[in-house]
């Protein structure tokens, strides 16, 4: 009888051990499955957070799109409320009646010259909607934009509603290129000007690309035979370009 009891007792203990092992295995398996399920959730949250952070990292910090793309044509009288600082070459814009004479100031400006208090004084005298600063070939030799940056800062402080446009230097004819001034030099200046405009959050107008010929130079058909004066039709084309590229 004792032998049977011992056998029964041994069976009971062995079954209990098997049950314990099975339960332990089931518990471990459940933990493992829960752990696996947790991983995708964690990855999902990470991906969502990463997506938000990525948008923030690559978000364009400027509010301008440069070069300014083509837009609807400006309303009549648009040039009555703008101020333009430009090289002497651009005087034709007022000579042919597109821009009022009182709104166009011409001279051989460099970035340093433009910075003078004259521009701020002009703006202070009238509520202009926009300021256009044209760059000429004289700017090629002086590519320091620190003074221009100061001017833009001053204008933004005094006239927060004024839109600022930096207009690229235009190409020159093949027969006016020299060792110290080429169309490649002008393109280099314009590249720096575009970069400066983006960093300063101001508008940039690519007038150079609008006028340049297939050979990378100003076509003779757009300019007078002598000097750097442009044809009347070219000035009218430039005026229309400005009126159809409003930021």
Feature-to-residue mapping (PLM):
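Generic structural signal for well-ordered alpha-helices
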Residues: 148-153, 190
């Amino acid at each position: 009888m004792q032998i049977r009891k011992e056998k029964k007792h041994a069976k009971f203990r062995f079954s209990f051990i098997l049950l314990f092992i099975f339960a332990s295995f089931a518990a471990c398996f459940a933990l493992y499955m829960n752990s696996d399920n947790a991983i995708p959730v964690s990855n999902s949250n990470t991906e969502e957070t990463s997506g938000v952070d990525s948008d923030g990292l690559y978000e364009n910090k400027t509010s301008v799109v440069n070069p300014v793309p083509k837009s609807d044509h400006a309303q009549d009288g648009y040039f009555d409320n703008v101020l333009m600082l430009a090289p002497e070459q651009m005087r034709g814009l007022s000579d042919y009646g597109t821009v009022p004479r009182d709104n166009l100031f011409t001279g051989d400006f460099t970035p340093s010259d433009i910075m003078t208090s004259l521009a701020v004084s002009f703006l202070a005298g009238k509520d202009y909607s926009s300021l256009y600063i044209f760059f000429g070939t004289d700017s090629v030799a002086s590519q320091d934009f620190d003074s221009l940056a100061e001017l833009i800062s001053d204008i933004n402080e005094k006239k927060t509603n004024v839109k600022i446009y930096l207009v690229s230097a235009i190409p020159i004819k093949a027969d006016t290129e020299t060792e110290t001034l080429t169309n490649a030099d002008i393109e280099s200046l314009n590249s720096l000007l575009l970069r400066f405009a983006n960093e300063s959050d101001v508008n940039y107008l690519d007038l150079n690309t609008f006028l340049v010929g297939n050979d990378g130079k100003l076509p003779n058909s757009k300019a007078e035979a002598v000097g750097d004066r442009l044809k009347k039709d070219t000035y009218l084309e430039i005026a229309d370009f400005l009126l159809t590229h409003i930021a």
